Design a protein with these regions (language model features):
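N-terminal signal peptide c-region/cleavage motif recognized by signal peptidases
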Residues: 19-21
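Gram-negative bacterial Sec-dependent N-terminal signal peptides
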Residues: 9-17
Length: 157
């Protein structure tokens, strides 16, 4: 009997550590998604308030767009990984991937259509930095997508 007890303890510890590591992984993805979401939402409303010139504002907005895309990618990747961990196969993650392709096309098309409204002028043609109206649109739609995914996939996140 005494020889079985010491052998059972390492086996029990192995099972417990495996179970806990799975929980930690799930929590890790949720944490990564939450950090990216919070970082992005903290920027909302105060974009480029210190920019004094049109060139400065456009450069700032482009930097903000890049930061927004980075936060979105972290958020999306963590959501995707959480879906994989929460299901027996990759079908939920693959379904999310399909919606992402459609959404990315929508984002570009919607912002291209919106910027056509500003036929002329600095809001559409601010110079070599790129159109600020389009950049603002891309930022706004990306943040909106993050909010939608967070709400829709709340049980996973």
């Amino acid at each position: 009997m005494k020889t079985r007890a010491p052998a059972a303890i390492p086996l029990l510890l192995l099972v417990l550590s495996y179970t806990m590591s799975g929980s930690a992984q799930n929590g890790k993805q949720q944490h990564i998604a939450d950090l990216a979401y919070q970082a992005e939402m903290a920027h909302e409303g105060g974009e480029c308030a210190d920019a004094l010139t049109l060139v400065d504002r456009n450069e700032c907005l482009n930097d903000m767009r890049i930061e927004t895309y980075k936060n979105y990618t972290k958020f999306f990747d963590a959501l995707r990984e959480a879906l994989i961990q929460a299901s027996p196969n990759d079908s939920n993650a693959l379904a999310l991937d399909g919606t992402e392709l459609v959404w990315e096309k929508y984002r570009v098309t919607a912002c291209d259509a919106m910027v056509r409204v500003y036929d002329m002028g600095t809001i559409k043609h601010p110079g070599p930095s790129g159109p600020s109206a389009q950049t603002r649109c891309l930022i706004q739609l990306t943040r909106s997508r993050m909010r939608d995914l967070k709400q829709l996939y709340e049980p996973t996140l």
